[in-house]
């Protein structure tokens, strides 16, 4: 599987901060470097991942209510990371809206940032089987004099790259930012930034790149074209992968859905959730932060015949509109308070764009080599055929931390 995300708070995702430039700006003092103790960071990260999961489900529900049909694919972790870093520069009601909207209100600012710091350290890795890169960058106008405390904390806590940029030359600036995002996402996110507002003085980007190999790969010879039932009476042809294996499986009678977990190598798992016919809406509305714990208690090992469509989907979202409906609006307005970034009171987030791409095939990741086989007990296999709209979640097992969330409506 190849998962790539762009976030531009103008989040790949991308963020733009707009405002007036003045000649004088009193810098704040540097804070001493942040040192996170292992036990404290892990505790904060675990709490953070629970809140992030709750935010992800809330966001999916909002997007699903806006569009009953169509694919949804996003990274709650990427969006939360970008706005948490941005919250270092916010105060008063602007900060409280971010904390409330992202479900961080139960955590102190210190614990929230320490949790992200620990999480980013643990998730960033590259091995033969797993490649995961999560990063942030701040593109700042050469004339802007940001608060030094903000820059220091963004670097210490979020390892953000600080890149001086000439926003008066928008054409070259746009090219350079797009090259940066493309390079960081292994050329998967192209042309993330378009039509930068002339008033932009700072642009924040966040990206996630993930490549993972299935623990047990599908045999391409078993892949066949089959019907995928989008809705009653309407089907599309899709390449359907097949595998018989031993997997964790369960049925949730309250949400009328079947759950199947398929592991990647390296403590990453894909969870597929297939609702009963006509129950997709019920499933979406029933998602909440403790659902994983509930499903874990129901799961048991089964021999399962699994059919999964080969996927290649991409999605782009205007997060400004979506987050405003979740009560996060001041950060986009003239009277928002981002004075911990700069003393200029006219600073605001101009755009917030989230872009993600998903490729899933028999190997897991394009071009991955090798194969695996399971020794299966002699029993009649269960069936899990993903040939109708379903939900999918990609998460890291140890926290556990949700990285990607999707509704596959039309592969």
From Swiss-Prot:
The gene is Serpina12. Forms a stable complex with KLK7. SUPFAM superfamilies: Serpins. PANTHER family: SERINE PROTEASE INHIBITOR, SERPIN, SERPIN A12. The reactive center loop (RCL) extends out from the body of the protein and directs binding to the target protease. The protease cleaves the serpin at the reactive site within the RCL, establishing a covalent linkage between the carboxyl group of the serpin reactive site and the serine hydroxyl of the protease. The resulting inactive serpin-protease complex is highly stable. One of its GO terms (molecular function) is serine-type endopeptidase inhibitor activity. The keyword Cell membrane does not apply. The lineage of its organism: Eukaryota, Metazoa, Chordata, Craniata, Vertebrata. It comes from Rattus norvegicus. GO terms for biological process: gluconeogenesis; glucose metabolic process; lipid biosynthetic process; negative regulation of gluconeogenesis; negative regulation of lipid biosynthetic process; phosphatidylinositol 3-kinase/protein kinase B signal transduction; positive regulation of insulin receptor signaling pathway; positive regulation of phosphatidylinositol 3-kinase/protein kinase B signal transduction. This is Serpin A12. Keywords: Glycoprotein, Protease inhibitor, Secreted, Serine protease inhibitor, Signal. Disulfide bonds: none annotated. It is found in: Secreted. Glycans are attached at residues 92, 267. It holds the Pfam family Serpin. InterPro entries: Serpin_dom, Serpin_fam, Serpin_sf, Serpin_sf_1, Serpin_sf_2. Its main location: secreted. The record marks 378-379 as: Cleavage. Expressed in visceral adipose tissues. Residues 364-382 are annotated as: Reactive center loop. GO terms for cellular component: extracellular space; plasma membrane.
